A protein has these predicted regions:
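Beta/alpha (TIM)-barrel catalytic core signal, keyed to glycine-rich beta->alpha loops juxtaposed to Asp/Glu
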Residues: 121-223
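Acidic (Asp/Glu)-rich catalytic clusters
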Residues: 14-17, 67-81, 106-112, 181-184, ...
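CE4/NodB-like, metal-dependent polysaccharide N-deacetylase domain
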Residues: 98-119, 157-161
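A short, structured active-site edge motif that brings together acidic residues
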Residues: 80-94, 116-122, 192-195
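A structural motif
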Residues: 51, 111-114, 164, 188
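Short, acidic/polar
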Residues: 33-47, 94-110, 148-150, 173-178, ...
């Protein structure tokens, strides 16, 4: 029970496979404005308030600190692992080493599995932390369905190994989805997309729903 919100009263959506997920969660991207300690402190407060879904990512640079908050909450009896829905993502430079990335996130987040594991971006182009927003990687490559499916296959293996429960995709477009969906063995449970009143992406939203892929909006208040 949260101190301000009863988690059981939060509306839920149901994935195609029957998994229920809270409709409201907390993102943990601190950008350059908030330190890992500030973000993890906010996570601690959110858990006590009643939040049960947390959207993390390897590239955010704060999973270790957030994991300590999760561990403290488990140890103090504030919440059990089964009550949390923890999401994280493989970053662009780890597309060939997805299991390594996943295992590091599991270790950092102090949990024995990930509820929803995303491919953060559909291409392997890498930008170092702290780089200028206008910088360009000379080794950048365009989207390749073959490269993406190689990465996705590794995620499917993580499901088989019990490291993750569901696979997510992120920052996709309809043409990209049409190229890769027929090649997948395990259907993606969700697609994370920028979604707010100023950028509604209605066509993509409808496409995902038609294919039983749950849209998840990031930056819901705009950015």
């Amino acid at each position: 029970m949260g101190e301000f919100i009863n988690p059981a009263s939060v509306p839920k959506v149901t994935f195609y496979n029957g998994v229920e997920v809270p409709c409201v969660g907390m993102g943990t991207f601190g950008s350059d404005r908030f330190t890992p300690e500030q973000v993890s402190g906010a996570v601690a407060g959110a858990i006590r308030c009643g939040y049960r879904m947390f959207d993390c990512a390897a590239c955010y640079g704060n999973e270790d600190q957030i994991g300590q908050v999760f561990q403290d909450a488990f140890d103090e009896g504030v919440v059990e692992r089964s009550e949390l829905f923890i999401m994280t993502k493989v970053w662009n430079d780890m597309h060939e080493r997805v299991e390594e990335s996943c295992r590091k996130s599991i270790a950092d987040l102090k949990c024995d599995y990930i509820d929803l594991f995303f491919i953060h971006w559909p291409f392997p182009n890498y930008h170092a932390p702290g780089c200028d927003v206008d910088s360009r990687n000379p080794d950048s490559k365009p989207f390749s369905a073959e490269e993406f499916i190689r990465t996705y296959r590794q995620c499917e293996e993580l499901v088989e190994k019990g490291l993750i429960r569901n696979i997510g995709i992120s920052n996709m477009t309809i043409p990209k989805l049409e190229a890769v969906l027929p090649l997948m063995k395990i259907q993606p449970a969700a697609c994370e997309m920028e979604l707010h009143p100023c950028f509604q992406q209605q066509e993509l939203f409808d496409y995902l729903n038609d294919h039983k892929i749950q849209p998840i909006g990031f930056m819901p208040l705009g950015s």
